Amino acid sequence: MQPAKNLLFSSLLFSSLLFSSAARAASEDGGRGPYVQADLAYAAERITHDYPKPTGTGKNKISTVSDYFRNIRTHSVHPRVSVGYDFGSWRIAADYARYRKWNNNKYSVSIKELLRNDNSASGVRGHLNIQTQKTEHQENGTFHAVSSLGLSTIYDFDTGSRFKPYIGMRVAYGHVRHQVRSVEQETEIITTYPSNGGGKVSLSSKMPPKSAHHQSNSIRRVGLGVIAGVGFDITPNLTLDTGYRYHNWGRLENTRFKTHEASLGMRYRF
């Protein structure tokens, strides 16, 4: 818990410093007023699972993030809305986004021989019995970056034209939810191979299914990110915005969750 508290304190301190810079810029530039922005973003989501070393201090730590979510590479398209204030060269904004739920299914089968009974002998007509166990394993998992509520400080470069590149920093409070449901079904099969050359005969019997394993967790973290992009002033109050942002959602137990986003949107200044 201590690293999380340190990250939160550092994030708030960093934000206060940036916002104070924006306030000073407002007094110098005269201010330009509030604005709203709507974006459509394409997000590449990266989930990386780290395992503690056998001799490490966290070797006995149980993670609330299932091994099911290991090295996931997925993507989604989602909307984002922002409300902010334009000070001239500096902008501050609060944004909110919801992400698409990631779903995945895994199905595996393993077959193990339990018993082999060879009843054939020299000069005696017999048959061969083989008893096997078939285990079917079905897993259904979801990983959902439910929402991200962020605060950003952005600096616009004045190029003397309608094009204005910008860079910025972002602090965000993210909510991630994930769950796994796992079911196993075992079937015992006895296969008979007649010695007279006839076709084999198989008899199967399903064992009582094991209780389903269900795991569900909800995690909230404060993370940091960077922003870059280019704005094009269509009118003095309307701007076409193309941007990129990288966000590290913070460490979710022994899992790292990061997003790379490219967006296209419109910004209107009042």
UniProtKB/Swiss-Prot annotation:
Signal peptide: 1-25
UniProt key word DNA-binding: no
Entry membrane topology: Multi-pass membrane protein
InterPro entries: OMP/PagP_b-brl, Opacity, Porin_opacity
Pfam families recorded: Opacity (PF02462)
Protein keywords: Cell outer membrane, Ion transport, Membrane, Porin, Signal, Transmembrane, Transmembrane beta strand, Transport
All ranges on the Periplasmic side of the membrane: 45-76, 97-142, 174-221, 247-261
Keyword Iron-sulfur recorded: no
GO molecular function: porin activity
Domain of life the protein comes from: Bacteria
Cystine pairings recorded for this chain: none
Chief location: membrane
Extracellular side: 26-35, 86-89, 158-162, 235-237
Localization of this protein: Cell outer membrane
Location of the region described as Disordered in the Swiss-Prot/TrEMBL record: 194-217
Example of a GO biological process term: monoatomic ion transport
Family: Belongs to the opacity porin family.
Job description of the protein: This protein serves as a porin.
Protein name: Outer membrane protein P.IIC
Species name: Neisseria gonorrhoeae
Gene transcribed to yield this protein: piiC
